[in-house]
């Protein structure tokens, strides 16, 4: 897990594991939407999720191009964008993929304003 807003493309022409920025035709729109979410999230906006084992991982403005972070061939985000013209971003909301129930109220508070800001944009 991590705490970041990721936008298309997740796949790159070279299929390298990481480090290849794969720009879509709507790159600026996707960055705008990702920043709309990330800028209201108390952890995401720092760009430093500080997840165990990935302490050095950083994301400027709390966002990343999917393929630049790690390449995903055949992902739903890219498929829906290319074939259905759906503008989707992927939200990684916690270092822990399955946080304990006791942490859910905190997660709601961390994401409430981000969700509202994102909905206002879309």
Language-model features: where?
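Metallocarboxypeptidase
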Residues: 1-122
